[in-house]
Amino acid sequence: MENLRRLNITKEGIQFPSIVVVGDQSSGKSSVLESLAGISLPRGQGICTRVPLVMRLQNHPLPTPELVLEFNGKTISTDEANVSQAINAATEELAGHGKGISNNPLTLLVKKNGVPDLSMVDLPGITRVPVHGQPENIYDQIKDMIMEYIKPKESIILNVLSASVDFTTCESIRMSQSVDKAGLRTLAVVTKADKSPEGLLEKVNADEVNIGLGYVCVRNRIGDESYEDARVKEQRLFEFHPLLSKIDKSIVGVPVLA
């Protein structure tokens, strides 16, 4: 797929399936993307993703990972230690210093050993109530942006849901169902499984929401844990936890998602 991209065949009108990541604010979207890419992304309270972040992961046996940001016709090289700051700086250039959003995309190319060959678009988390510094119509702005990306039939919708919420009332589920009623191109990633293990088995086995591509339950990386430590703890969690160990092993863990 990446070879075709390089040939610019997309200009001929061939559509590539892209994975569009959607979720309510604080659902754990950034954590899922971090786990797949093995790099730290901007995190924090409130809205972190303020522009469409196109992440292109390429598995390369490089001694040192190569990270490049592309936006506004610029190309900026960065590294794992500084990528989060570089994304924040680029976001401010694209969307301003406040808390507003912009439809101008920011591309992050990651060439790294062991990452899956994937292209994903991370979109702002859905928020219903504008906080200080956000435009009054922030919900409509975010919804319009999400709909633009998930409408194409080629888009695979990766819906990030916190284990603590009722899936049937999730705004991101409502949006994806409005364009993919049968759920044939919708995959759900359930985050924070360790925080809300009660009833999770029943939720992912229920037929209340059409998730055609199924569920994957994950444990989010906590604080300064290394990615290796986080994966080991995740594996143990789903193996030995009295409730979570009952969930089918084919739908648990970040490696399954990759």
What are these regions (language model features)?
Residues 9-258:
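Globular "head" domains of long coiled-coil molecular machines
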Residues 1-10:
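N-terminal pre-Walker A segment at the start of P-loop NTPase domains
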